[in-house]
Each structure stands twice: as C-alpha cells, then as structure tokens.
C-alpha cells in the first residue's frame, strides 16, 4: 500500500469512471485495481468524515461528480502514495471549518506537509526566506557566506532569488515557483539523495526585456554610479 504509482498509471479509464460514479469495479482478476479502488474510496470517506457539511443537500449525481474530480486531481498531480495522502489528511484535520476543500487545495496540503516532514519550510516560509535574503545579502561577501540553516535552504533560496531577479517575478509568480521547488527538493530528500554544499554560481542572465521606462531608469542608475555624462536616450 506504500506506493501505488504503477497501479495508478495502469488504472484504465473505464475503472476510473466506475469508481468516480460510485459503481462496482470490474477487476478481471487484477488485485492491484481493487487495491487502488479501496485506497481512493477510503480517502474520500475520510475527507467526508472530516468535513461533514460537504454533502448537505447534494444528490447522488453531485456526489459522483465530486468523487470524479478528486480521482482526477490525484492522478494529474502525482498523489500516488499513502504517505502523501496521510500528509494531506493531517492538515485537513487541523482545519476549523466543516466544508470539503477543493481538490487543488488538498493537493497543496499533501505537498506542503510532505515538505515540512522532510525538514523543509512551507511555501509561505520559503518566500519569506527569499525576501529576507534580499534584504540581508549585502551584509555578506557572497551567498555562500550567508548563514544558511541547511544545504537545502541555500539551493532553494538562491535558485528562487536568481529566478526572481532574472524574470522580474511578481509575488504570486514567486509563490508558484517556490511550491514547485519544494516539490522537487522534497522528492530528492525522500529518495535519500545527499544535498550538496553551497557552491559559487554564475549569475543568471537574460529574462524579461525591460520596457523603455525601466531601461532609462537603469541607464540613469549606471551613469550616477560611475559619474558618467552624456545625452539622454
């Protein structure tokens, strides 16, 4: 029951349709299909028990559609292990409202709790770390001299910082990138991979082109810094 990735990949469309619509499965002597079905149904039952107001005044067709959306969300977002599901359920049980979260919210809970279990920050904490690094980086000769709590923190923050600078990321874009970085780093740690120590990195060049106002401001900054004179652009 620890890893159902292979079963989920091989779980054919008809079986998924039958489970989503609360119909009996057709196993064709495939015990792994029954196992996947039991896991999905068990998770859905836990969610409904945790959020009892979710199905109030809903008919069976609506319930079936909710089940279908959850099945699809698990498959599309790689929620393939009971460890991931249990991580999401730990967050779900801490909620103080009786309504079922969206499939996307539950997937985010699975990932966030998995990251925390692996010794990493959650998305909000990681973004705060990036902003703090932006404020304090000038106090240190280089990124490698910054007081990182772990090798993983170094790679997460510096990668996001470079991406933010190169592509002028908004706060919302930075948070999406942070979520992606945490998924990858969590997977590396869970595989037992040794995260390398900080090493000097070349600056990331390129990214989004500047508009005219930004270009003029950058030119003025360079002129002021080096005491240059010349005609305006």
UniProtKB/Swiss-Prot annotation:
Query: One matching Pfam family, short form?
Result: Phage_lambda_P
- Can you cite a GO biological process for this protein? DNA replication initiation
Please report any disulfide bonds recorded for this protein chain, giving both cysteine positions: none
**Alphabetized UniProt keyword annotations:** DNA replication, Host-virus interaction, Viral DNA replication
**Quaternary structure and interacting proteins, as annotated:** Forms a (host) DnaB(6):lambda P(5) complex in the presence of ssDNA.
Q: What does this protein do?
A: Loads (host) replicative DNA helicase DnaB onto single-stranded (ss)DNA at the origin of replication. Reconfigures the DnaB hexameric ring, generating an opening large enough to permit ssDNA into the central channel. Necessary for the bidirectional replication of lambda DNA. It interacts with the ori (origin of replication) region of the genome during the initiation of replication.
* Family according to the record: Belongs to the phage P protein family.
Q: What is this protein called?
A: Helicase loader
Which source organism does the UniProt entry give? Escherichia phage lambda
According to the entry, what is the taxonomic lineage of the organism? Viruses, Duplodnaviria, Heunggongvirae, Uroviricota, Caudoviricetes
């Amino acid at each position: 029951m620890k890893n159902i990735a292979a079963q989920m990949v091989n779980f054919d469309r008809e079986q998924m349709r039958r489970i989503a619509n609360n119909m009996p499965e057709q196993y064709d002597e495939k015990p792994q299909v029954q196992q996947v079905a039991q896991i999905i149904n068990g998770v859905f039952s836990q969610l409904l028990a945790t959020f009892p107001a979710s199905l109030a005044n809903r008919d069976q067709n609506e319930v079936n559609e909710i089940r279908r959306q959850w099945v699809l969300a698990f498959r599309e977002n790689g929620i393939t292990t009971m460890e991931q599901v249990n991580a999401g359920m730990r967050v779900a049980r801490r909620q103080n409202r009786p309504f079922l979260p969206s499939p996307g919210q539950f997937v985010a809970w699975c990932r966030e709790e998995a990251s925390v279990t692996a010794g990493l920050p959650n998305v909000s904490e990681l973004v705060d770390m990036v902003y703090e690094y932006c404020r304090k980086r000038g106090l240190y000769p280089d990124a490698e001299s910054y007081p990182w709590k772990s090798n993983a923190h170094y790679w997460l923050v510096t990668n996001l910082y470079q991406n933010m600078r190169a592509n002028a990321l908004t706060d919302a874009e930075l948070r999406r990138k942070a979520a992606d970085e945490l998924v990858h780093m969590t997977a590396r740690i869970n595989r037992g991979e040794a995260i390398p120590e900080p090493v000097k990195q070349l600056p990331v060049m390129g990214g989004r082109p500047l508009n005219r106002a930004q270009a003029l401001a950058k030119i003025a900054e360079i002129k002021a810094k080096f005491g240059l004179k010349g005609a305006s652009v």
